[in-house]
A protein has these predicted regions:
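Glycine-rich beta-strand-to-loop/alpha-helix junction loops that act as flexible
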Residues: 1, 75-76, 100
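ATP/NTP phosphate-donor binding region
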Residues: 1-64
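Short glycine/serine/threonine-rich phosphate/pyrophosphate-binding segments
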Residues: 3-5, 78-84, 116-117
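Accessory alpha-helical/coil subdomains and C-terminal extensions
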Residues: 17-28, 144-211
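Catalytic cores of soluble, metal-dependent hydrolases
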Residues: 65, 211-212
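Structural motif
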Residues: 69-70
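Short Gly/Thr/Asp-enriched flexible loops that form oxyanion-binding sites at enzyme active sites
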Residues: 73-95
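Internal gly/pro-rich beta-alpha loop/helix module
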Residues: 100-174
Length: 212
């Protein structure tokens, strides 16, 4: 997003197109042959079932191509963990899929987005990232989708995995993994959205004297 002040934390989400994001980090061209595609341009607070379904199908379509070795998804932080978890269940490939975002607007004095994007591309391009499920690359850490939690609304170190710890980290343009998840994901998941046009709706009823 973009903000009115270089030192403030307020911003308007969904304002920067994918082309501008890539142009802001020319160093990624030294890592991989990166092509940008704009799926949607919304604030992540407006994510919904249909966007998730469209995104999962598009990713599965792209990952079938032999010339694509991995995918990076730029995403707002409000619903990044939900999107990561959904894709972890519905992507049917062992190729790396990495979500990345920023806690500070692109207009901030020390914006975190450019380095986060660089690290995400490094992660997606690394052979070591294969078959590790959907990943989140934020502030130098590599997190598994099933464990990622947003802990703070302004701190750049907000995305963490409090119950299991980070899978690894990026340092000086290289990835280092300390552990892998043993939970089923992606190709092992039983969920398949290939033939769905909409996600099933599940109603939750509330009985009279419930405090829930």
């Amino acid at each position: 997003g973009t903000g009115s002040s270089a030192t403030g934390t307020s911003y308007t989400a969904g304002q920067v197109a994918i082309g501008a994001l890539l142009d802001a980090v020319p160093e990624i061209k030294d890592i991989a042959n990166v092509t940008g595609e704009q799926i949607v341009k919304i604030g992540s607070q407006d994510m919904n079932d249909q966007v998730w379904l469209t995104l999962a199908k598009k990713i599965n379509e792209l990952l079938k191509r032999p010339d694509i070795d991995g995918i990076v998804i730029t995403h707002g932080t409000d619903t990044m963990e939900e999107t990561a978890y959904f894709l972890n269940l519905t992507v049917k490939s062992d190729k790396p899929v990495v979500l990345v975002g920023a806690m500070r607007p692109s207009t901030a004095l020390s914006a975190d987005g450019p380095l986060n994007l660089y690290n995400a591309v490094v992660t997606a391009a690394a052979k070591e990232s294969k078959d590790k499920g959907v990943l989140v690359a934020m502030n130098g850490l590599i997190l598994g989708a099933q464990s990622t939690v947003k802990m703070n609304t302004v701190d750049v170190q907000t995305f963490q995995a409090p119950n299991s710890g980070a899978l690894g980290y990026v340092l000086n343009g290289k990835v280092f993994y300390n552990q892998v998840t043993l939970k089923k994901h992606t190709t092992q998941s039983v969920f398949d959205v290939t033939h769905l046009n909409a996600l099933p709706k599940v109603g939750i009823g509330r009985y009279g004297n419930s405090d829930a």
